[in-house]
Design a protein with these regions (language model features):
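Solvent-exposed, charged helical/coil patches
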Residues: 1-31
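Enriched for short, Lys/Arg-rich terminal
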Residues: 3-4, 12, 23, 38, ...
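Secondary-structure transition/hinge residues
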Residues: 18, 34, 97-99
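Amphipathic alpha-helical interaction segments
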Residues: 18-21, 46, 70-71
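A short, surface-exposed loop/turn module that caps and links secondary-structure elements
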Residues: 27-55
């Protein structure tokens, strides 16, 4: 089973989401990720991967792998802020202490 940790930035983004249905879809997706099923996801380079959520405006979760089974959820966003969110995730990852 995978362990998902959250940055403060990710936690704040998720907490501020007003779309209750989308929030439920995201929580369901994160639950599946703990079981190893990341679904529609791809590596973006620089150690950052993107999990695409097919709900609302196309939500995205940016994460990195830490060790065998630990994943750190870096940043969340949607399609309209994708380029900025990817850069934020990469910058945040660089600023975090190594494993």
């Amino acid at each position: 089973m995978n362990t998902l940790l959250q940055t403060d930035e990710f936690r704040a983004w998720l907490g501020e989401l007003k779309d209750i249905r989308a929030k439920a879809v995201i929580f369901n997706r994160l639950d599946r990720a703990t079981k190893g099923n990341f679904g529609d996801a791809k590596a973006l380079g620089g150690g950052v991967s993107e999990m695409r959520i097919d709900s609302g405006p196309g939500y995205r979760i940016y994460y990195t792998r830490r060790g065998e089974i630990v994943y750190l959820l870096l940043v969340g966003g949607d399609k309209s802020t994708q380029a900025r969110d990817i850069q934020r995730a990469k910058n945040l990852l660089k600023s975090l202490p190594k494993e």
